[in-house]
From Swiss-Prot:
Pfam families: Cpn10 (PF00166). HAMAP family: CH10. Belongs to the GroES chaperonin family. The lineage of its organism: Bacteria, Bacillati, Cyanobacteriota, Cyanophyceae, Synechococcales. This is Co-chaperonin GroES. Heptamer of 7 subunits arranged in a ring. Interacts with the chaperonin GroEL. Together with the chaperonin GroEL, plays an essential role in assisting protein folding. The GroEL-GroES system forms a nano-cage that allows encapsulation of the non-native substrate proteins and provides a physical environment optimized to promote and accelerate protein folding. GroES binds to the apical surface of the GroEL ring, thereby capping the opening of the GroEL channel. The gene is groES. Its main location: cytoplasm. It comes from the Bacteria. PROSITE patterns: CHAPERONINS_CPN10 (PS00681). NCBIfam families: PRK00364.1-2, PRK00364.1-6, PRK00364.2-2, PRK00364.2-4, PRK00364.2-5.
Length: 103
C-alpha cells in the first residue's frame, strides 16, 4: 500500500462538507493571564479552505453550497472531524453545522 501525503491542496470534501482551518486559540485572557494548552477553549471559528460540490437533491441535482472558499465561519462546538496537518488544525464538517458567516 502506497503512503498518502495529505495537504490542504489534496483534500476535496464530498457532498455538502467543508474543510475549515481553525482559528488560533486565545493565548491569554482579557486580564493578561497566559493560558496553558489544556485550559484553552476550542475555537469555533475558522476560514473555509475547501468546499464540496453541494448536497444532492432527491431528483439527483446538486444544491450549491451557501459558503465559499475564504469565508470566515462560526460553527457548532462539537461538529465535524478534527484533523491536524503540519502545525495547523482543521475541521471537516457538514454545511448544516455552520451557524454563521462572520464579516
Amino acid at each position: 500500500m502506497a503512503a498518502v501525503s495529505l495537504s490542504v491542496s489534496t483534500v476535496t470534501p464530498l457532498g455538502d462538507r467543508v474543510f475549515v482551518k481553525v482559528a488560533e486559540a486565545e493565548e491569554k485572557t482579557a486580564g493578561g493571564i497566559i493560558l496553558p494548552d489544556n485550559a484553552k477553549e476550542k475555537p469555533q471559528v475558522g476560514e473555509i479552505v475547501a468546499v464540496g460540490p453541494g448536497k444532492r437533491n432527491d431528483d439527483g441535482s446538486r444544491q450549491a453550497p451557501e459558503v465559499k472558499i475564504g469565508d470566515k465561519v462560526l460553527y457548532s462546538k462539537y461538529a465535524g472531524t478534527d484533523i491536524k496537518l503540519g502545525n495547523d488544525d482543521y475541521v471537516l464538517l457538514s454545511e448544516k453545522d455552520i451557524l454563521a458567516v462572520v464579516a
